[in-house]
Amino acid sequence: MSLPKDLLYTEEHEWVKAEDGSYIIGITDFAQDQLGDIVFVELPEVGDTVTKGDSIGSIESVKTVSDFYAPVTGKVVAVNETLEDEPELINSNPYDTGWILKLTEVEEADVTALLSSDDYEKGLD
């Protein structure tokens, strides 16, 4: 299982990457493996304000449909529109081309509450 050290994580298997004042978000390698082959992703709308813990979309695989939750509060400034035609990118590269959305205006307290890669990995055992 791939687990980049430079990302932050949630217990719900989302990852968060700080980049130039914004935060890129996706699901972890563990999560995509549990879901199986992903066939559809419902994305939030650019301009939406999302609240930590709220369902902001869904990920459909051959096994199940799973809600995707906001790991932090913020404003959606971009979504990975490539996933509309190629949702399997989440399976093949969840930390790069399989990213899901980008937020700004993020609550700093939400970021500090996220898990390090070591703490996230301990929770998987």
UniProtKB/Swiss-Prot annotation:
Binds 1 lipoyl cofactor covalently. Residues 22-104 form the Lipoyl-binding domain. Gene3D superfamilies: 2.40.50.100. Its cofactor is (R)-lipoate. It comes from the Bacteria. Pfam families: GCV_H. GO terms for cellular component: cytosol; glycine cleavage complex. One of its GO terms (biological process) is glycine decarboxylation via glycine cleavage system. The modification N6-lipoyllysine is found at K63. The keyword Transport does not apply. Keywords: Lipoyl. The glycine cleavage system is composed of four proteins: P, T, L and H. The glycine cleavage system catalyzes the degradation of glycine. The H protein shuttles the methylamine group of glycine from the P protein to the T protein. NCBIfam families: gcvH, PRK01202.1. Belongs to the GcvH family. This is Glycine cleavage system H protein. The gene is gcvH.
